[in-house]
Amino acid sequence: MNTKEKHSDLIKAEAIRLGFLSCGISKANFLEEEAPRLEKWLKNNMNGEMQYMENHFDKRLDPRLLVDDAKSVISLTLNYYPEEQQADGTYKISKYAYGHDYHHVIKGKLKQLQEFISEEIGEVGGRAFVDSAPVLDKAWAAKSGLGWIGKHSNLLTQKTGSFYFIAELIVDLDLTYDHPVTDHCGTCTACIDACPTQAIVQPYVVDGSKCISYFTIELKNEIPQEFQGKFDDWAFGCDVCQDVCPWNRFSKPHSEPLFNPHPDLLSLTKKDWEEITDDVFKKVFQKSAVKRTKYAGLKRNIDFLK
């Protein structure tokens, strides 16, 4: 075993020990295949009012512009599939937001992984990324062999489905690189057929400006009336395309205590949601990603669903 293989194996083993679901590594270079796709997606205004998607176009496609002398992209996934879910007949929030804000949880684990690399390998330059910088997470995870990008544009695996977060360490260390896996979507169109707002405009292409997650989280203005009655009771985010995916039959509950829901969340009825106060909002969602939409945003969403 050469040094690169040894270092790669050490990093992967520690990632799993820290609770990550999987870890893969790819060479830090320009994403040639993704460049024209991203350009076309932006040109067709599929980012809606997410102006930040238009910024740092070059950096999104080349990690060497984000990290000096970048050699490797270490991609990691962290399971968030819950053991318990909201009851039927109430307003719904995406399962990723049940527990503590994933940014904070994952950053803590990435910091530990960086410290491990420094201790075991030596001084390694790099940066950690958790859905908060111009990095194409899913593209790097796919290049690293962690899964394939499904027709709903989420990363998929045969063994664990798609309910997991993706994070990266971009480092100036040469490592052994993994290979992409085969696409196993086949002729299935379950996600396309089930999308309440027809946001999956063709296989592998999601029009972000039509997605319920966009309307309930990203959009700051009023939700267009043309979508009234099409939200299937989703008040924050939407999991429909993942819920109907056959590969998610194999999703297993996470083992991260911080992702467990607030005790009051699962028992909220529609009436509770409609009468929610700012105090209750702060109590239940103080540490959740739901706080991103703020109390006023959640109220707007619920009013739209009534």
From Swiss-Prot:
**Pathway given in the UniProt record:** tRNA modification; tRNA-queuosine biosynthesis
Q: Which InterPro entries match?
A: 4Fe4S_Fe-S-bd, 4Fe4S_Fe_S_CS, QueG, QueG_DUF1730
Is Iron set as a keyword in this record? Answer: yes
Extract one GO cellular component term from the record: cytoplasm
Q: Name one GO molecular function term.
A: 4 iron, 4 sulfur cluster binding
One BP annotation, GO: tRNA modification
Q: What's in the keyword line of the UniProt record?
A: 4Fe-4S, Cytoplasm, Iron, Iron-sulfur, Metal-binding, Oxidoreductase, Queuosine biosynthesis, tRNA processing
**Where found in the cell?**
Cytoplasm
Q: Does the keyword Cytoplasm apply?
A: yes
Residue ranges of the 4Fe-4S ferredoxin-type domain?
173-205
Q: Which reaction does it catalyse?
A: epoxyqueuosine(34) in tRNA + AH2 = queuosine(34) in tRNA + A + H2O
Q: Where does [4Fe-4S] cluster 1 bind?
A: 185, 188, 191, 245
Give the primary localization class.
cytoplasm
Under Enzyme Commission nomenclature, its number is 1.17.99.6
- Enumerate the residues binding [4Fe-4S] cluster 2: 195, 211, 238, 241
Report which superkingdom the organism of origin falls in.
Bacteria
Q: How is the cofactor bound?
A: Binds 2 [4Fe-4S] clusters per monomer.
The EC class name is oxidoreductase
An example of a Pfam family matching this protein is: Fer4_16
- Signal sequence range: none
Query: What cofactors are annotated for this protein?
Result: cob(II)alamin; [4Fe-4S] cluster
HAMAP family the UniProt entry points to: QueG
Q: What is the protein's known function?
A: Catalyzes the conversion of epoxyqueuosine (oQ) to queuosine (Q), which is a hypermodified base found in the wobble positions of tRNA(Asp), tRNA(Asn), tRNA(His) and tRNA(Tyr).
Q: To which protein family does this belong? A: Belongs to the QueG family.
Oligomeric state and partners? Answer: Monomer.
Q: What's the protein here called? A: Epoxyqueuosine reductase
Query: What organism does the record attribute this protein to?
Result: Cellulophaga algicola (strain DSM 14237 / IC166 / ACAM 630)
UniProt lists the gene as: queG
